[in-house]
Amino acid sequence: MSARKRKFNSLKPLDTLNSSRASSPRSSASLPPKRYNTFRKDPKIVDHLNNASTKDFLPVLSMNSESKRQIELSDNDVDNNDEGEGVNSGCSDQDFEPLQSSPLKRHSSLKSTSNGLLFQMSNNLGNGSPEPAVASTSPNGSIISTKLNLNGQFSCVDSKTLRIYRHKAPCIMTFVSDHNHPKFSLYFQQSVIYNSQVNLLDDVELIILDKKNSFMAIILKDLKKVKMILDVNNSSININTNILIWSTASSASNKKIKSIKRFLLMSYSSSIKVEILDHKEQILERLKHLIHPISSSSPSLNMERAINSTKNAFDSLRLKKTKLSTNDDESPQIHTHFLSNKPHGLQSLTKRTRIASLGKKEHSISVPKSNISPSDFYNTNGTETLQSHAVSQLRRSNRFKDVSDPANSNSNSEFDDATTEFETPELFKPSLCYKFNDGSSYTITNQDFKCLFNKDWVNDSILDFFTKFYIESSIEKSIIKREQVHLMSSFFYTKLISNPADYYSNVKKWVNNTDLFSKKYVVIPINISYHWFSCIITNLDAILDFHQNKDKNDAINSDEISINNPLVNILTFDSLRQTHSREIDPIKEFLISYALDKYSIQLDKTQIKMKTCPVPQQPNMSDCGVHVILNIRKFFENPVETIDVWKNSKIKSKHFTAKMINKYFDKNERNSARKNLRHTLKLLQLNYISYLKKENLYEEVMQMEEKKSTNINNNENYDDDDEEIQIIENIDQSSKDNNAQLTSEPPCSRSSSISTTEREPTELHNSVVRQPTGEIITDNEDPVRAASPETASVSPPIRHNILKSSSPFISESANETEQEEFTSPYFGRPSLKTRAKQFEGVSSPIKNDQALSSTHDIMMPSPKPKRIYPSKKIPQLSSHVQSLSTDSMERQSSPNNTNIVISDTEQDSRLGVNSESKNTSGIVNRDDSDVNLIGSSLPNVAEKNHDNTQESNGNNDSLGKILQNVDKELNEKLVDIDDVAFSSPTRGIPRTSATSKGSNAQLLSNYGDENNQSQDSVWDEGRDNPILLEDEDP
């Protein structure tokens, strides 16, 4: 034998006995080096030699017939291209002479390289011969330690939800077989996946593989908590599982799984249970049967499956978009729920197929046969909240978080208002009267106390009380001083913005006795659109100090050391996290005006800064008031620290800021905030009751409470009755005479909502109206309204009794038709439409047909009448007015006369009227404009036009006295002259007579003094011309 050593690692054994080099060992020196005249070996050959060296020196295994049969089955499941793959295929041991000092040399094809085999197969396995191999096992019979690396996809099944969680790819499985036991570990990014080490003998109960060598499922004996890193956002989650799944994506890895399968079948077939199925779908079905054995399913189990199926469908919506990758069997890797309603649960390892067998027993969902009562259905204690539903968590929670986790449902219970039980408000009597140390007192009634139940809106009384209560508590603890803080009422901001023209004037009286710029903190609760938020104004005292020491600051600035003006900070906090820049602008305007008025400080708007401060967000739309109370309480527990937290929140990230704010403001304790506030009030009430009993005032206070509650109930019933009040108008017609009496009740004052453009037509002809300037205009000119200051008094509803006389030119049938067509001015056609179509003027007498043919309508724009006050001096009352009214009552109507009756007051009706009065006043009703015309006597038709002027001048003295007395009486009795009645004969030409008495005269119902009419004044210059009387709206 040659003295040269054999190289077993990378070179073939050399036959030095038969070679030429053996005869002349020294001849190698004369030969040229081979590196210059030979080619380098092919890398594949080098790799083949390197891999074959380990295999050749392994001992040959001897196995029984059963093991041989299983290996034959496993070899036959590969395609025909693998037929030459077998160990020792195409080679024989007889080709080489065995050496006593070395194992037998074994040749194998290139296809079998790099498979990491841990054992050597005998050449007689294929023919099933029991003859042992030529080379037996090594004396010690041990197996050399070997490691095998597989690249693929790792998944596991959650034991609770039966969901498959796929680890982020790629993962590496390291299979190791040593002298102890076979085991494997999983790696990701060169680090071991937590708790993924598995010992096959100790931990594994069953291993299932497919014949394609692309899929392997390992069922563990016990649960293991495995840390999975998911595809979405690299989020990690710990999963309790006993099913591990390994799949491959490349053909190269399949042969390594095949090697593991062979090793398990031949070496550990008795200690490890191994099953080989045809394809992956059968493995999945096998896993389903292992988890849920086939049995008669109860209705409750079917219902649970139905719920899980629904959740699985929504869970699939939350997954990241599917990524498809092709492999040998062209199956896309799709992550889906494990136990879904699809025939093949794991689409990540199989092809997409159409659902063809939904009617199978394992896929059908049976309807529970048990009857459920409505009370049990709607009043279950275990009802899950809306927040726990998968759809509700699409944006709010971790996508892969278990939605059926009871801890998760409890954590979000604050968002579920629908399932909260109704709270019965406790009776809070007597009302709490609490007086603080600064002298201010607050009262909390039973109605206020109810606001703290059932997530009701907190009213102003509760908010004002508790903000004051917690500020006083901080003062008592010496956290702040009383002179450093000022609390505004919750109505301050509402009053501030009541008139946008001048904000400061709206609340000037509220702050006259305050010194706001000496306060360090000014708290202003704000309510806008039924939402509470608050702001705290700081640094006002620094502004005042700066301007008071302005001379010193100027001296410092002259030495080239500048001192900037301090800034006023308005710290605004809203539990809905809204910004309120516009709402804070009125407060800025108020501070500027207040500083100028109170301290003569010119404050610029740029010196006032609003800062939005983060606070915990409210979970509903009703707890804003509670959050304002708690935020103010937390602020005054440590104002400096709270301001620092708000300053630092601008620097931190948004996520970190939310966690820091929620922790600082104790958001978790706000679920019981209403209960704590109620408890505080009950304790204060107990102290108050003990004080009342000590002073012997308890019984008296309770009686007052009962009386007050009784009055409130009565008022509520009264208000309910008032809601059904209707305006009813009655029209009484008399067939005996041609007179109609209308009774209506207009509202007490004209509504501001009535448009000023509304006009009521009045049909007059040649009517004469006196203007305030003394001029007389006809009806074809626009009358000038007399202006007078309006009074602020509001008159109660007044009952108007209006007499409408028959027109001398309208027949009885026509008058009746007009009365039937009459409707109220508030609900239909105005009453003036039903008046006489023509009133004879003073210019020329006309006949019936002429009067009817010459009628025309004149629009009188007087929606808001006003009185005329003629003079400052009120004349003395004359007896002419009294005799005029009484005489009108007793006079009988004459066929040739027209009776004109003025209804003033009840006193006028009782006093009587002088029948010798030469003239009577013609009054034309202006209805809803309340403008009355008091005309002079209507002349005889036979007289000429120029006689009218002479008669008017001759009666100036007598008529002037009458009008002066009317002026005084109208001012004293506060009456309105509303209507004019004309009594006309049925035949002949109309004329006036001072001595005639009309039995047909209709009197107007008197206005009572209790109606408290606004004053009327008469504009008079002693003339007998018509006078304009106007009523002023209250």
From Swiss-Prot:
Highest taxon listed in the record's lineage: Eukaryota
Modified residues (Phosphoserine): S788, S903, S983, S984
Enzyme kind, highest EC tier: hydrolase
Compositional bias annotation for Polar residues: 845-856, 876-904, 912-923, 992-1017
GO terms under cellular component: chromatin; nucleus
Gene Ontology biological-process annotations: chromosome condensation; mitotic spindle assembly checkpoint signaling; plasmid maintenance; protein desumoylation; proteolysis
Sequence ranges of Acidic residues compositional bias: 74-85
UniProt-listed Enzyme Commission number(s): 3.4.22.-
Record field: compositional bias (Low complexity): 19-33, 743-756
Region of interest called Disordered, as start-end residue ranges on this chain: 1-42, 71-110, 388-419, 731-800, 841-960, 983-1034
Keyword Transit peptide: no
One annotated GO molecular function: transcription elongation factor activity
Keywords, in A-Z order: Hydrolase, Phosphoprotein, Protease, Thiol protease
Function statement: Insertion mutation in SMT4 confers temperature and benomyl sensitivity; high copy suppressor of a temperature sensitive mutation in MIF2.
UniProt record similarity statement: Belongs to the peptidase C48 family.
Further remarks about this protein from its record: Present with 450 molecules/cell in log phase SD medium.
Protein name from the UniProt record: Ubiquitin-like-specific protease 2
Organism: Saccharomyces cerevisiae (strain ATCC 204508 / S288c)
Lineage: Eukaryota, Fungi, Dikarya, Ascomycota, Saccharomycotina
Gene, per the UniProt record: ULP2
